[in-house]
Amino acid sequence: MVMPSSSESTFRVFNEIGIISQLANNAFESCLPDGLTVSQFSVLNWFIRVDVEATPGRLAAAFMVTKGAMTNTLKRLAEKGFVDVRPDENSGRRKLVTITADGQRVRLAALKAVEPLLEEVLTQFNSAQISACLPFLEQLRAFLDLRRSV
């Protein structure tokens, strides 16, 4: 048996992660309440994980999307009452975005709605298997996050 080269193995890892991402996002989105998309949920989740307030530009940079794409996502979230977009009092042009109580509620509802999917995953893979891959995935994410400006 011929062993794959290191670069082939690395490519296979990235390929698998990409496919898993597509499949997981589709499965996750089918569980989301209130017509929420994965992109919208991700923005709500960012406010819980990272910071309570941000400019649209900061969010666009964090998600590596255009300002226009982020503005569209924020507009849809604001229409649903899940974020508040208001002028920055210290700037005539900038806006500040925060998650609302309804946004926090729908985020929690989304996490609750995805529990059956997560439980189904645990019927195929035990928690030790899942926990074992986390350190590598976290390190890879951190490495790629540091490189994003390169």
Regions found by a protein language model. Name each.
Residues 56-57, 68, 75, 95:
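Residues within helix-turn-helix
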Residues 15, 42-46, 71-73:
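Base-recognition residues in the alpha-helical recognition helix of bacterial helix-turn-helix
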